[in-house]
């Protein structure tokens, strides 16, 4: 069987890579930022579409939805000034990704792995809460970091390779 090029075999994957590279190179050019927002969202959005088309398992579908939320969150963070909508979309991404990881838990965790899980879960929001200079934002950032820490902890406790 002949080896086909990535462009023939997985064009959405190649387009996703191209969009990611294009965004980071074009943002230093003379183009208005408004034109770059869809390119930024396309990098992860095309991964979501690729995943949806190539895999039909419930985990893959949930991960595709998660990538879709992350793509919209990326674009919302570029558009919005208060970052609420982007933050909520990324919060949703973390919760959906956590769902994939929790459905694929390791049957047993060693004591060191349990310690790592608890550390990620607790320290991520605690550190994030102390970081903002604007203390009015500390609670929102801490809540977001709780979802981030929970996702990282559930990924660590999953059967997926580290």
Stretches with model-predicted labels:
Residues 1-162:
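Polytopic alpha-helical membrane-helix bundles and their juxtamembrane interface segments
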């Amino acid at each position: 069987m002949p080896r086909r090029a990535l462009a023939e075999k997985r064009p959405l994957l190649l387009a996703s890579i191209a969009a990611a590279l294009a965004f980071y190179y074009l943002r230093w050019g003379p183009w208005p930022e408004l034109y770059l927002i869809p390119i930024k969202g396309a990098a992860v959005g095309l991964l979501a579409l690729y995943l949806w088309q190539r895999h039909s398992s419930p985990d893959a579908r949930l991960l595709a939805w998660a990538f879709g939320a992350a793509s919209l969150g990326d674009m919302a963070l570029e558009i919005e000034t208060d970052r609420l909508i982007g933050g909520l979309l990324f919060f949703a991404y973390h919760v959906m990704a956590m769902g994939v990881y929790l459905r694929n838990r390791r049957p047993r965790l060693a004591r060191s792995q349990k310690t790592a899980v608890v550390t990620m879960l607790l320290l991520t929001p605690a550190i994030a809460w102390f970081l903002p200079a604007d203390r009015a934002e500390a609670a929102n950032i801490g809540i977001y970091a709780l979802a981030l820490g929970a996702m990282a902890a559930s990924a660590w406790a999953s059967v997926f390779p580290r």
